[in-house]
């Protein structure tokens, strides 16, 4: 899919859902990036486009959004990392994470968010350090949701990765003795239902 079609899709969905550019861009890119993308100009990289499309509740063919080799390498590393974590191979995951950190633009909130999420998961699952995991998950959430607050969660526009991160955060809170997953689970379900 070329940038003109991606931009048209984003604009169509954003207008249809009555979502402001400001709200869609919050925490992931500038408003001008969305305006340029909607106009069919090169404005956003793969990970930003993926998050924008996700926040609009759309699934996408990730390969079609990729615009360069580095995006593909980072995407492949994310897939390998996820696989190693699912297999509980935390040492291998840590090696892949170091490789990811070396390749990724850590100025990008989306890459930093992913790194902190993985570090949080390893802290939680391998080291059973729920306090460090809580810190990592919270820092990751606030990278794309700078005014993150569970009490105001309904006001935020969340993409798939942010929902996964939020569930990890709340699940870890359970391990710290805070019963928040049940309290905020209905809001998460509403997001999932809206995205279907």
Task: Pin down the residues of each PLM region.
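Helix-turn-helix repeat elements of alpha-solenoid scaffolds
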Residues: 85-99, 126-147, 174-193
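Short alpha-helical DNA-recognition segment
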Residues: 16-36
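Alpha-helical residues within helix-turn-helix
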Residues: 12, 22-23, 51
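Short, charged recognition helix plus adjacent turn
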Residues: 65-91
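A short, Lys/Arg-rich alpha-helix, primarily the initiator
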Residues: 1-16
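"A position-specific structural signal for the A-helix of alpha-solenoid helical repeats
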Residues: 9, 75, 79-82, 111-122, ...
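Flexible helix-coil transition and linker loops at the boundaries of alpha-helical arrays
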Residues: 66, 101-111, 126, 142-158, ...
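DNA major-groove recognition helix of helix-turn-helix/homeodomain DNA-binding modules
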Residues: 47-63
């Amino acid at each position: 899919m070329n940038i003109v079609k991606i931009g048209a899709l984003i604009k169509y969905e954003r207008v249809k859902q009555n979502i402001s550019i400001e709200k869609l861009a919050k925490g992931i890119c500038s408003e001008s990036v969305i305006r340029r993308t909607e106009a069919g100009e090169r404005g956003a990289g793969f990970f930003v486009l993926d998050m924008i499309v996700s926040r609009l509740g759309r699934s996408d063919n990730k390969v079609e959004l990729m615009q360069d080799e580095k995006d593909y390498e980072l995407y492949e590393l994310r897939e390998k990392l996820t696989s190693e974590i699912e297999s509980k191979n935390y040492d291998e995951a840590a090696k892949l994470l170091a490789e990811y950190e070396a390749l990724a633009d850590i100025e990008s909130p989306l890459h930093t968010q992913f790194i902190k999420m993985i570090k949080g998961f390893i802290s939680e699952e391998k080291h059973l350090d729920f306090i460090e995991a809580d810190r990592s998950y919270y820092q990751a959430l606030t990278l794309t949701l700078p005014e993150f607050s569970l009490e105001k969660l309904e006001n935020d526009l969340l993409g798939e990765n942010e929902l996964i991160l939020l569930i990890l955060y709340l699940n870890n809170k359970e391990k710290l003795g805070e019963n928040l997953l049940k309290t905020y689970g209905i809001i998460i379900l509403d997001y999932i239902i809206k995205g279907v």
